[in-house]
UniProtKB/Swiss-Prot annotation:
Species per Swiss-Prot/TrEMBL record: Pseudomonas aeruginosa (strain LESB58)
A Gene Ontology cellular-component term: plasma membrane
Protein name as annotated: Sulfate transporter CysZ
Residue ranges of the TM segments: 24-44, 69-89, 148-168, 214-234
Keywords: Amino-acid biosynthesis, Cell inner membrane, Cell membrane, Cysteine biosynthesis, Membrane, Sulfate transport, Transmembrane, Transmembrane helix, Transport
Amino acid sequence: MPALSGPQYLGEGLKLIMRPGLRLFVLIPLTLNLLVFALLIGFAMQQFSHWVDLLMPSLPDWLSFLQYIVWPLFVLLVLVIVFFTFTMVANIISAPFNGFLSEKVEVVVRGRDDFPPFSWAELLAMIPRTMGREMRKLAYFLPRALVLLVLSFVPGVNLIATPLWILFGIWMMAVQYIDYPADNHKLGWNEMLAWLRSKRWACMGFGGVTYLALLIPLVNLVMMPAAVAGATLFWVREEGEKALVK
C-alpha cells in the first residue's frame, strides 16, 4: 500500500470511522469525550481570564504598549494548555475503546482479522494494559510539559513558550495516536518512539494536522476517533510491523 501525507491520513481516517461496522467503536468514546469536553470547557470559561492574567508578565509603564502585542500570545498559551489537558484526560478515559477501534480499522484496511473477536470481557481485559500504556505516555509527557510550564513564567523566555508548546503538541499527537496500533501489536514503548523518530517528518505532518483539527471545539470530538483510524492507517501504510522484527 502506498504511503500518504499527514493530512491524507487524517482525512482517510475520518472516512473510515463512517463505515457501519466501525460506528459502535466510535460512538462510545465519542460520548465519553463529549462529557469530558463539557465539564472542562465549563471550568475553563470561568477561569480563563484569571489564567491569562497569571501568565502575563508585569510591564513597566513605558512598555505598557507591548501588552497589546504579547497578550494574544498568552491567550494562545492558555488555549494550548487547556487543549493538552482535554486531550490527555479524554484519551485516558477512552483508551480501551480506542484500542479496539484501532484493531477494527486495521481489519478493514488489511482485509483480514488477526485479532480476538469483540466482547465486553475482552474489553475489560484490555483495560489494565491500555491504562498502563496511557500512564507511560503521561510519564513521557509530564516532565517535558513541566519544563515548558516553568518557561511560561520566566519573563522574556516565556515569549518562546507558545511555539515550543505547539511543536511539542504536534509531536505528542503523533505519539498519542500512533501508539494505539503499535500497542495492539505489543511493540515496546522505546521501540515505538524509535520507529516514530525514523519517520519523523511523516509523524510531524500527521501530528500537525491532528493538532489543528483537535483545537476546533466540537469538531475535535469527531476528530479524536478519526485520528485513531488515521494513525492505524499510518501504521499499516508506513509498514510499522517491520519495527516488530529484530
